[in-house]
């Protein structure tokens, strides 16, 4: 195991072992214990009481974080004609059809989100093995298969993110940067949590939100009290 840096060990020392922090305290502590010299990303991971192998327990959706993630997403749009022009005007980073499909089939995935018009999904669907594992496949349920590509691009650039529970029943969200105000981080955390709770499958039995952890890019994990579900009321 690689030896931890002195900065990391100092960060760990500030976190009370076995304690579950309120969300507001957790994000403040994450800012205070960031061992990196750069403006690190702050992420939250939720462990859910679901079995993602069962279709009726797959938790997937979108959320618009009120303060964004701290970085501007690189958006790719599969479109032609007027819709391609609309995507370009909206600020899409990559726009095309067959050319992009061929490039992605070769393994290129240097973008953060993908949008497609319905008429191109027959071709885009063939990229499932490349885009699927990276959660980049356009999907009508997340608003990324649409004729209104400009709206989709604007929402993604404005902080809308897609999420899907992984095979270990975890969900991961970027909620901002260390440089964010603490209240901004709390409000982003609350937006993510509210949507996760709203999407609880009816077939999920027992405790749904089992664990929550806040961390910076290279920082230690900070356990958040999973019983606090009304975050802004308790902040």
UniProtKB/Swiss-Prot annotation:
A Pfam family (short name) is Ribosomal_L1
Does the keyword field hold Repressor?
Answer: yes
GO cellular component terms listed in the entry, alphabetical order: large ribosomal subunit
User: What PANTHER family does its record include?
Assistant: 54S RIBOSOMAL PROTEIN L1, MITOCHONDRIAL, LARGE RIBOSOMAL SUBUNIT PROTEIN UL1M
GO biological process: any one? translation
Q: Which domain of life is it from?
A: Bacteria
The protein in question is named Large ribosomal subunit protein uL1
Species name: Renibacterium salmoninarum (strain ATCC 33209 / DSM 20767 / JCM 11484 / NBRC 15589 / NCIMB 2235)
Q: What is the lineage of its organism?
A: Bacteria, Bacillati, Actinomycetota, Actinomycetes, Micrococcales
**Keywords linked to the UniProt accession:** Repressor, Ribonucleoprotein, Ribosomal protein, RNA-binding, rRNA-binding, Translation regulation, tRNA-binding
Q: Which GO terms describe its molecular function?
A: rRNA binding; structural constituent of ribosome; tRNA binding
